Amino acid sequence: MTQLKQARKNIITPGMKAIAKIEGLPPEFICQGVADGNIVIPANKLRKNLKLCGIGKGLSTKVNANIGTSTDFGTVESEVEKLKMAEMAGADTIMDLSTGPKINSVRQSILKNTCLPLGTVPVYQAAVEAKDRYGAMVKMTADDLFSAIESQAKEGVDFVTVHCGVTRQVIDTFKGQGRLTDIVSRGGTFTAGWMVFHQAENPLYEHFDHLLDICREYDVTLSLGDGLRPGCIADATDRAQVAELLVLGELVKRAREAEVQVMVEGPGHVPLNQIEANIRLQKSVCEDAPFYVLGPLVTDIAPGYDHITGAIGGAVAAAAGADFLCYVTPAEHLSLPDVTDVRNGVIASRIAAHAADIVKGVNGAAERDRQMAIARKKLDWDSQLNLSLDPEHAKLTRDRFKTKGKACSMCGDFCAMELAEKHLGVSVSRC
């Protein structure tokens, strides 16, 4: 019985109780959210010792870290190292996006070495194996694709990105649209390429009920991928993107009817003035399903700093109602990320998530900032470091130019707070 089915029977599962405790909310709230489909708990029934994570309405904004090999770089060991860094930096979930050699070994090692929910894009495995077996990715069969999905579900994968909304009709809309960057989603490109080669409908759409059967058996959460997400801000919110979203809205309803948990993925590259509209559109079309966004990146001209462009967009998106941020690293658009890139990406997205949680009124979010203000007024450095989002980095930065007095090295003897306390009689009790 899936979490969704139990919630509809008003059964509060241990997982729902755990999420309620983490979020500081009543278990009944979590149960109702799962039943309504606006909260998901990605948790394959075969996973053991899983650190549960609730994603959706009324909960804190979550952050995902992508890792994985490419055809040119990456090993099992390198990806496990990135995994550990992502965990240390505070990621809530992990996705393995491997496309390189030993693709199965990488995924299995990640599963073995993490207690965080793990997501994948199964078409990557199917494409890699088809290239090895048949000489070309497009020669994979529908059975190959569903076999990859089922084998990963049996291993314990908690959520899968599937590009079900890339239909023949949507492809026609895309062709008529005219884009600067065409299709930038690998999964979307694999799917569209297969459809054109075979002159056939997307098997994930045509056989969506089969996909639901697999997910229901293992309680795998569906993450409906946006294969036609915009790859530059000039392509944002175009007809192709919206056409796919309309299909995803229909599939959300079918997944819920099948008692399968489902969330929806979103753009992408979006200028600041279009982000809120994108969130509102998705929430309306997809009936308040949890929204999982990549960034969004708000400008295209900052390679090497796209963790910042993604954090800017992520903060605006989450404040407007997005529930789940996929991190962006400084290596985006340039290379495979290394361990340092992973850390910086997670931290940047966590800052965005927290900033949005203050706006959302998430339990404890604003209070943490209030406590930081009090600690700063007191020049209480231990408390400031403990309250900081990245205590290790904060301590290293402070220790670079440590002064003799209580103030930091920026102001020294001219610390505004210390002078106000001394000469104006302004005490910390006013904070």
From Swiss-Prot:
Similarity comment: family membership: Belongs to the ThiC family.
Pathway(s) annotated for this protein in UniProt: Cofactor biosynthesis; thiamine diphosphate biosynthesis
Function as written in the Swiss-Prot or TrEMBL entry: Catalyzes the synthesis of the hydroxymethylpyrimidine phosphate (HMP-P) moiety of thiamine from aminoimidazole ribotide (AIR) in a radical S-adenosyl-L-methionine (SAM)-dependent reaction.
UniProtKB keywords: 4Fe-4S, Iron, Iron-sulfur, Lyase, Metal-binding, S-adenosyl-L-methionine, Thiamine biosynthesis, Zinc
Annotated substrate binding sites: N66, M95, Y124, H163, S185, R186, G187, D226, G227, L228, R229, E265, Y292
Matches recorded under Pfam families: ThiC_Rad_SAM
The protein's name: Phosphomethylpyrimidine synthase
Keyword S-adenosyl-L-methionine: yes
InterPro entries: ThiC, ThiC/Bza_core_dom, ThiC/BzaA/B
Gene behind the chain: thiC
Residues annotated to bind [4Fe-4S] cluster: C408, C411, C415
Biological processes, Gene Ontology terms: thiamine biosynthetic process; thiamine diphosphate biosynthetic process
Keyword S-adenosyl-L-methionine: yes
Obligatory cofactor(s): [4Fe-4S] cluster
A molecular-function term among this protein's GO annotations: carbon-carbon lyase activity
Catalytic activity: 5-amino-1-(5-phospho-beta-D-ribosyl)imidazole + S-adenosyl-L-methionine = 4-amino-2-methyl-5-(phosphooxymethyl)pyrimidine + CO + 5'-deoxyadenosine + formate + L-methionine + 3 H(+)
Note accompanying the cofactor annotation: Binds 1 [4Fe-4S] cluster per subunit. The cluster is coordinated with 3 cysteines and an exchangeable S-adenosyl-L-methionine.
Residues at which Zn(2+) binds: H269, H333
EC number: 4.1.99.17
Enzyme class: lyase
Species assigned in the record: Dehalococcoides mccartyi (strain ATCC BAA-2266 / KCTC 15142 / 195)
